[in-house]
C-alpha cells in the first residue's frame, strides 16, 4: 500500500516527497488547472516533477489504485467501497469553469431543462 510505504502528507509541502500522478502534458489538458498538485505548497519557482503521467482520469484512478502514487481525483470517480483515502482534505483544487452548451432552438425544451437541473445538482454534490 502506497501510504504505508511513504506515509500520509500532513501539509502541501510534504508532496515534495511523494510520487504524484498527473495528467500528461503531451495531450491537450481538459482543464488548465488539472495538474495543480505539482505546484500547491511548492517553493516559488519550483514545480514538482510527476512520477507518472496518464492521458485520462480513469487511468489516473487505476494508477492510484495500483499504489503508484497520489493524484487529484474527483470524488465521483472513487467508489464508496474503494480502499482509496483522501489526503490533505483541507486543500481544494482550483475552481474550474464548465459550460452546458446546446442549440439555441432547444432553449425551451423540457428535456434540456431537466438535464440542466440534473447537472447542476450533481456538480453541487461533487468535490474535486
Identify the meaning behind each predicted range.
Residues 98-108:
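A bilobed periplasmic-binding-protein/Venus flytrap-type ligand-binding module shared by bacterial periplasmic
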Residues 1-98, 124-128:
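C-terminal regulatory
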Residues 107-121, 127:
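Short amphipathic alpha-helical coupling segments at ligand-binding clamshell hinges
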Amino acid at each position: 500500500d502506497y501510504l504505508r510505504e511513504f506515509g500520509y502528507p500532513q501539509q502541501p509541502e510534504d508532496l515534495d516527497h511523494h510520487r504524484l500522478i498527473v495528467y500528461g502534458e503531451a495531450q491537450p489538458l481538459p482543464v488548465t488547472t488539472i495538474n495543480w498538485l505539482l505546484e500547491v505548497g511548492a517553493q516559488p519557482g519550483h514545480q514538482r516533477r510527476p512520477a507518472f503521467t496518464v492521458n485520462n482520469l480513469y487511468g489516473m484512478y487505476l494508477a492510484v489504485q495500483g499504489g503508484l502514487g497520489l493524484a487529484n481525483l474527483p470524488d465521483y470517480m472513487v467508489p464508496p467501497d474503494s480502499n482509496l483515502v483522501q489526503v490533505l482534505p483541507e486543500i481544494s483544487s482550483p475552481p474550474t469553469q464548465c459550460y452546458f452548451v446546446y442549440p439555441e432552438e432547444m432553449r425551451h425544451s423540457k428535456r434540456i431543462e431537466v438535464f440542466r437541473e440534473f447537472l447542476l445538482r450533481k456538480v453541487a454534490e461533487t468535490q474535486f
